A protein has these predicted regions:
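A residue-level marker of the well-folded mature domains of exported/periplasmic proteins
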Residues: 24-135
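Short, low-complexity disordered leader/linker segments with a strong preference
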Residues: 1-34
Length: 135
């Protein structure tokens, strides 16, 4: 090859590299909202106690942090497992359960789903369960 052709080819390669480096960055996907899901005990969401207080915390996080918050009310003890499974299907990032009555169902569900995060209000486990926080 002639010296001129080599010089031209080198300039084209360098120019191509510079143009590629200056290209716009691919648009990043917006971060998905964190979904926090609460299951009440049989007292309902407006019990003026633990259920209402926990839900108020989630509502505050929705407003201040931009998370997504949902709840399911348990009308009877038999609803606990059904509600836990519903939120597992919805792929909640954190499932908050409220009250000692839901403690056994929360533990069983957490142990069967170790990659899901749980929190329980008004209950503690001894020994602690690895994926249940806020005990």
């Amino acid at each position: 090859m002639s010296k001129r052709l080599m010089t031209l080819l080198s300039i084209l390669i360098v120019a191509g590299m510079l143009l590629a480096a200056c290209g716009t960055k691919a648009a990043e996907a917006p971060a998905a909202k964190i979904k926090v899901c609460q299951i009440t005990d049989t007292g309902g969401i407006d019990d003026k106690s633990f259920n209402a207080t926990a839900w108020k915390g989630i509502e505050d996080a929705v407003t201040q942090l931009g998370i997504e918050g949902k709840y399911l009310e348990s009308k009877e003890v038999a609803d606990y497992e059904k509600n836990l499974n519903a939120f597992l299907e919805e792929k909640c990032d954190l499932i908050v359960t409220v009250g000692y009555l839901i403690g056994d169902a929360t533990k069983a569900t957490a142990e069967a789903n170790p990659n899901v995060k749980f929190s329980i209000v008004d209950y503690a486990y001894d020994p602690a369960v690895a994926n249940i926080v806020g005990q």
